[in-house]
Amino acid sequence: MFRSIRSWSAIALFALMLAACGGDKKGDEESSGETQAACTRSALGAAPDLPKGWPDLSEVTYTLQTEQGPTTVVEGYFDGSLETAHDDFKRELEAAGFTILFDEIEEDDSEVSWKGKGRSGQVALREECGSDDKIFVHVTNRPA
């Protein structure tokens, strides 16, 4: 009898573990919809709220801006490849006097973490606009 209880307990525990590993499809769909909006909207009507001296890359179009507490999030797209976007942001941030805290480029995404002018944040770049030559841009900008 105890062996049967232990077996059923093990099966129940395994089922719970599998259920806990399931992804949140709704969250993924919402994120994808927000990304597509940033990739397809028109440019912001005013300059985005980024630190003074922020590089003005001609290939970047900022389309969305939101406030999340003390953090400003600016999104849009980069006309060009992921590698070019990564290299341009890193180079131009350094040239504008920002310190690069960390940068990484992978097959489908990239990050450049920065600090300067009393602010810090990250430029996240992802191949999620539907083509290899249009890259989703997500910039976080918060007090340092």
Residue ranges: model-predicted function:
Residues 2-11, 15-17, 22-144:
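An acidic-aromatic pocket/loop used at catalytic or ligand-binding sites
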